[in-house]
Each structure stands twice: as C-alpha cells, then as structure tokens.
Amino acid sequence: MAPSIKLSTMATSLHRAHGTSALLRRPRLWAPRLSSIHATPTIANLRASFTTSSPRLFAPNGSAKDESKPAVSTVPKTTGRGPSDPLAAIDKTAQEQRKADWAIMKEMSKYLWPKGSWGDKARVLLAIGLLVGGKVLNVQVPFYFREIVDSLNIDFSTTGGSVTAVAGAMILGYGAARVGAVVSQELRNAVFASVAQKAIRKVARNTFEHLLNLDLSFHLSKQTGGLTRAIDRGTKGISFLLTSMVFHIVPTALEISMVCGILTYNFGWQYAALTALTMVSYTAFTILTTAWRTKFRRQANAADNKASTIAVDSLINYEAVKYFNNEAYEVGRYDKALAQYEKNSIKVATSLAFLNSGQNIIFSSALTVMMYMGAHGVATGQLTVGDLVLINQLVFQLSVPLNFLGSVYRELRQSLLDMETLFNLQKVNVTIKEQPNAKPLTLTRGGEIEFKDVTFGYHPESPILRDLSLTIPAGKKVAIVGPSGCGKSTLLRLLFRFYDPQKGAIYIDGQDIRSVTLESLRRAIGVVPQDTPLFNDTVEHNIRYGNLSATPEQVIEAAKAAHIHEKIISWRDGYNTKVGERGLMISGGEKQRLAVSRLILKDPPLLFFDEATSALDTHTEQALMENINAILKGLGQKGEKKTSLFVAHRLRTIYDSDLIIVLKEGRVAEQGTHRELMERNGVYAQLWRAQEMLMTEEGEVSKKGEKEEVGEKKEA
C-alpha cells in the first residue's frame, strides 16, 4: 500500500484546513492547461509546458500562481464581532483588560449558576455552606491554641494534676477543629467538581460546534495547531476560574473579614487596622504587578501557539519534509519559535520572582510589627502569652490563603487570557446563515441547477466569476472544463454555500439556495474531491462516514460498487485497516475509490466529481468511470436520474457527458455535447486535439523505449 505523494507542504496544510474538497490543481501527467491553448498546439510546445514549467497552484483570486514563488495568502480576513485573528496577541490598556476580564467572568457566572439546573444550583449552595463551615472551624483553631498555652502556663509540680485534666478537652477541640476544616474543604471540592466539569464540557462543545459552523475562509486562514492549543488552554482555564471564584477569592475575603473583626473585638482597632492595611497593600501590589506581567504571559502564549502550529504542520507534512531534505529547516523554524517562547518565559519567571519577593516583604513586615505590639502588651500585663500566640496564629493563618491568593491571582490572570482567546473564537461571526423562515430543499424537477448572473470573488475587487449564467439540466451528466482559476471548484463552494455570491443567485429546482436550510442543501449534494479527506481511522469508518447509520453489508456493497472491495479484503486487517493521518498509509487511487464508496453510501441526488479519477491508472479509471456511469443511471427516491457535475482536465473521462460547459475568465465560453463542440472547432476542440497529440507522442516514446530496452538485452 503505497502512500499518496503530496507535492508541497502548502498542499497538505491547505487540504487539512479545507477538509472537504481539494484546493490544489495537481500538475497533469498529460493534460495541458486550457489557458495555454490559444496558440496552435505543437508537440514541442506541449512538451515544454511539462518539462520547463513549474506546477501551478489554484489561486482564490482567479489567477494561477507559480509554485516556485513564495505563496501569498489571498484568503480574506475574518470579519464580524470577533477580532480578525482571535489567536493573535493583542496588547490592551489596563482598562480594556479589566473590561474584558469582567465580561468573561460574567459569562462564566452563567455556568456557575445555570438556569433551570436545580441540581447544579444545589451543589453550589452546598459547596458554599461547606466553605463557610470550614472557615469558621479554621478560625477556631487559634483560640483553642491560646487556651491550651494559657492553661499550661502553671507550675505542675506545685499545683499537681495532669495535662489531660488541665488541657485535654481543649486539645481534643483543637484537633477536631482542624480535622473538621480539612474534611469540609475536601467535601466542598468533591461536591463542586460536577459543576466545574459540566461547565468545561459545555464551553468546549460550544466552541467546537462553532468552529465547525464557521465559514471556509476562517479555516483557510487559521492553522490547526494554534486552534487546538488555544482550545486546550482555554478549557483548562475554565476549571481554574470557577474553582478560584468559589473557593479562593471569596473564602479569602471572608477569612480576612472574620480575622479583622476578631482582632478588633479582642485587642482593639489598632491590630485590625494594621491587618487591613497589610491585606490592602498585599492585594494592590499583587494586582498591579500581575497586570504588568500579563503582557509577558500573552507574548509567551503567542509563541507557544506558533511553536505548536509549526510542529503540527511539520509532522502532518512529514513526507514533504523528507522529499526536500528540509529537516534542518523545520527544526530551525521550530527552534526559532521556542527561542521566542524561552525569551518571554524568562521575563515571566523573573517578574514572578519580583512579585513573590514583594509579597513576602509586605507580609513579613506587617507580622513583625504586630508581634512587637503583642510582645509589648504581654510585657505591660495587658495581654497573656496565649493572646500573643492567638494574634500570631490568626495573622499567620492568613498567610496561607494570601500566598495562595497571590498565586491564584497569577493563575487567574493566565486563565482569563486563555479563556479570552477561547471566547474570541466563539465571537467570530458566521456569515453564512440560514434565513429565519428557511425551508427544507425539495427536488420537484429532479435537481435542475441554475446559476443566474452570478458574480463572485474571494476578494470582491478581483472577481473569479463575472455575471455567470448557466443551467445544469436535471438528471444529466454535465462536465465543467476550463483553465485553473476560472472558477470550476468555486462553483461547488458556492453551490454548497461555503460562500455566497456578491451578485446574482443560485437555484435548485427554482429554489434560491439561500432560502433553504443548510442541512437539507448539503445533504442533497455528494462530493468526490480530487484529494480525498480521510480520518485516521479504519477503512470501514471512512466509508460509513457517508451514512453513519449504514450496516456493514451496505458498506461492503458500496466498496464493491467502487471497485475497492477486493483490494480491501487483501489487506491483513481488511475493513479494520487503519488508513493513517489523512489516509497517508494508502495510495491516492485507493483514497479516491474510498471517496466514491462514501458517496455511493450517501446516495445524494446531486453529485459533484472534482477530478475524481486523477490518481487512478488508465485501466482502473476506465472501470471506475463505467461504474460511476452505471450509478448515475440509477433512479433516485422519486424516480429521477441523478444530476452530476464533473470537473475534469482529462477530456476522455467526460467526452460522453450530456453537456460540456467550457469556462473562461469567469464566464461560459461555449457549451454543448462533445460532437457539437468538436464541430464548432473552438476552445474545447483545440484542447481535445492537443491532448490527443500528446497521448500519441507519449505512446510512441513508450514503444521506442521498450524496443531499445529489448535491443540492449539481446546485445547483452
């Protein structure tokens, strides 16, 4: 099973982003470009076109680009409510960042207190109850400690008695309070886990669903590595944000308030004022410093996305890397991105050291002053030693949540940044939408397709189709031919509503496709692309993808109809054979026959074949075309023959079409049957003769080579 060969890294990356139809026009083995047929075709010219010209890539702006030159993206930027690039690192002012943070927290509060979900609300309330109970028990611990110290401040040799009699009850109370606080904390975590995980699932699912619903232009302009990395970090941030909101920020504020109240009541306002001042200073320093550090983390995230994207692209395009000996180049690209990540991560680490040092200085200074005040009270007889211990324990007990709050705030900022990217993805506008009153597509005429005065360009200022009008009769086999960039594959994208035309309309049986539901429209169209997108799963799964409810018997019948069954059962694992990433473990011809099997299983009334036999040898191509023609003659659910469109450069594969439409410069140059077009002696006739001449010469060259090889063997 030879792997299919990809001609460039751009080919595979564009295919991966596209996922539905091939974006590239492979160099034809013997079919010359229609764009070159204006001159009288000669054998010398035809040979030169294949031996000296670079492969040409299909350009969305309607032109053909030389692959030897650096490719420039022609995909329009995503427009809508979200940013043009939701993955980009955008520096914001402090006010803008706070506004964005509050918007995210407001959004997440919906998941914290979900409407209609009384079970989740009960869990949140129970978690809060356990939280308050745990904090109350935690604050009781220093009081037990004070009583133990004061009760033991006696001369046991004089008074007699034992530790159990003097402080036993308080020691048990001390232990019970600590155990109760810990148990409450763990129960709280267990109760709230369900709420957090449900939120993660909902956000991740909504984001994934939104990505699948986004326009083709978005996926052409984004790289999978960066998207998956952003989703991964964002979903992890959700759990931390919800947990920190409920279990860290609110509890710490509650504990600080309780400690300040206790200090004021027992020892005077001075202790409470010093504690409050310390907390305010600590919090302000943490917030300001973390806000300053945010830009370093954002830059590190951008570098991380870049490195992940490069790694994924290089591994997916493994064969292309090997074909051109570019391992060192790819490693260099990856290392360059890692170097940028290293640079920004060092800034993150050094600024973190500054933050930690400042926090410890503030807290330690305040604790030192408070201990001096307590020691002075003991010396003057106003306080007992137990009171000094109580003050120390109460304030020092705040160090744990405060230190944790510092790290929580840092991680909270990180989570908010990650979630900002995630929610920005959800804000990217979907431009291809159903009308509110959209109805299912109904084929009342058998599937007649009409393009009426259609003008479209990926860039509006550079239209590919210009006032294009054509009709594809219902139940007929129609071929679309023309030079690369004339809009052949664009017809499918418009028909499938990946894009809407800037002008004009497209009708199926008289129904404007913009007025029907997307689900019914796309279910009615079956596609066999030039480069078949396959999942890294079994052969059976990839065929069944055309109809997920199909039985194993139906899968086998579809494979037989596509002339791939015998090949599949010859493999060791048969239909359970894994095809590899994008089907790289099987040949291009096998991939295309799997695509035909998938189409047969879907059984749609409208069929689109985009160079569907380009990777097949002549014998297999002929057999498969005969089988496809037999399928086309099959009747649909209502008795109509299937309407089929073939995009082709090999004219021998479509000469028997009921109608052949030749596109040129975004318009219909001519149309008719093969006989009519040959009699007209126009563009189509020139191309046909050019291909026939080339095939004749190639046959002569092949025979000459065989004779020379036989002669050499005889001489030997």
Curated annotation (Swiss-Prot):
Q: Where is the transit peptide?
A: 1-18
Enumerate the UniProt keywords alphabetically: ATP-binding, Membrane, Mitochondrion, Mitochondrion inner membrane, Nucleotide-binding, Transit peptide, Translocase, Transmembrane, Transmembrane helix, Transport
| Transmembrane regions | 124-145, 169-192, 242-265, 267-287, 354-372, 388-409
EC numbers for this chain: 7.-.-.-
Segments on the Mitochondrial intermembrane side according to the record's topology features = 146-168, 266, 373-387
Q: Where is the ABC transmembrane type-1 domain?
A: 124-414
> What residues bind glutathione, as annotated?
293-297, 356-359, 406
CDD domains to which the protein is assigned, alphabetical = ABC_6TM_ATM1_ABCB7, ABCC_ATM1_transporter
Q: Where is this region: Disordered?
A: 57-87, 697-716
Sequence ranges assigned to domain ABC transporter in this UniProt record:
449-690
Swiss-Prot/TrEMBL GO biological process terms: intracellular iron ion homeostasis; transmembrane transport
Q: Which PROSITE patterns match?
A: ABC_TM1F, ABC_TRANSPORTER_1, ABC_TRANSPORTER_2
**Compartment annotation:** Mitochondrion inner membrane
Q: Which residues lie on this side of the membrane: Mitochondrial matrix?
A: 19-123, 193-241, 288-353, 410-716
Quaternary structure annotation from Swiss-Prot or TrEMBL: Homodimer.
Sequence similarity:
Belongs to the ABC transporter superfamily. ABCB family. Heavy Metal importer (TC 3.A.1.210) subfamily.
How is this protein named in the record? Iron-sulfur clusters transporter atm1, mitochondrial
